[in-house]
Amino acid sequence: MPAVTGKLAAASLALALIAASASTASAQKKYDTGATDTEIKIGNIMPYSGPASAYGIIGRTEAAYFKKINEEGGINGRKINFVSYDDAYSPPKTVEQARKLVESDEVLLIFNSLGTPPNSAIQKYMNSKKVPQLFVATGATKWNDPQNFPWTMGWQPNYQSETQIYAKYILKEMPNAKIGVLYQNDDYGKDYLKGLKDGLGAKAASMIVLEESYETSEPTIDNHIVKMKATGADVFINITTPKFAAQAIKKISEIGWKPTHFLNNVSASVGSVIKPAGFENSQDIISAAYLKDVSDPQWKDDAGMKAFLEFMTKYFPEGDKLDGGTIVGYGVAQTLVEALKKCGDNLTRENVMKQAASLKDFRTEVLLPGIKINTGANDFAPISSLQLMKFKGEKWDLFGDVISADAGG
């Protein structure tokens, strides 16, 4: 009997050890809704239709990039299930799609949804649900507010910073400028306008001769451009989305107006704005960049650009490589993958935000040299540097230094 007892004791000890190791393994793995041993479910909302549909290519690029990641084994062995819906850049529709993603699809997080009004419409909802609204595709300053909105984080340089850089340039190079501003009549446009005024400081009132707003429902902004020229403005600040940016460039040429033209970064795509507007109409436009430009020959031997072009050829051959949206989608998707890798087996929503807020000197393959991604518990603005550029021939030429442009939030 003693031998049998010994065997039973050994067997029960072995079972206890197996149970203990299993519980240790499960203790190490933490999941919230949307994550399992095999999958990470990520939601996204894009304007695949409507007035801002040019940006839909960002979502399509992200879907292709996650397909690449899945083919390469996923993130820590988990495949990405990317669920992307159309909101037509309509905030009520964004709310509907966000609820669907969170409550029906049960995603772990919503990633890189596009537009200031759409994201503003779901910010309180996302924070009340404690679901990450991560790396939103808008540069509004309000996304850098971890104290009041700890579940919302931006990605690109903020709009106020960008127009502050333009203001500094104008004050230095054109101190007697008469400035006309065309801006979209929503949070997006007003954020840019505030940055410009803050950058001009006391001179804003005397230098700005016209502030003209437009609605996204307008079919054309031609009348606003004609009105702008009539003021005698010699500097034009163009705060628009791609469709209207291209219209403005064409109309300025058509009526023979020759201001120094500043075009906001989000409408500086060669593929979706400059080319349709006409290269001949776009000469000497000034903008700012934080990402490499595919059309710029200086990057032809760059390892990061080569990797991007190989990705496009293999995973998104129908995508326009010249469209700035493809570079954006690629860069922001790489940033999300980095944050999720850092989560390890702790895929709770809280840890996703913690890791997203712990990025140090991270570089995607498509950021300009000297620009890095840094976040912290009190810094939800991953990218805060830009470089000025001028359109020459069929491409943007960078000039000056990389400028750090932190504006409060």
Predicted regions and their residues:
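Beta-alpha junction/loop-to-helix N-cap segments that form part of ligand/metal-binding clefts
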Residues: 28-31, 39, 54-60, 72-145, ...
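Short, low-complexity disordered leader/linker segments with a strong preference
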Residues: 1-41, 403-409
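Periplasmic-binding protein-like
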Residues: 101-114, 134-136, 179-183, 232-242, ...
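Segments of small-molecule ligand-sensing domains
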Residues: 314-315, 319-327, 337-396
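Extracytoplasmic "Venus flytrap"
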Residues: 31-63, 85-92, 114-115, 182-191, ...
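Extracellular/periplasmic Venus flytrap/periplasmic-binding protein
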Residues: 92-96, 103, 141-144, 149-255, ...
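Immediate post-signal peptide segment of exported/extracytoplasmic ligand-binding proteins
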Residues: 27-44, 71-79, 171-178, 346
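Extracellular/periplasmic periplasmic-binding protein-like sensory domains
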Residues: 252-328, 402-406
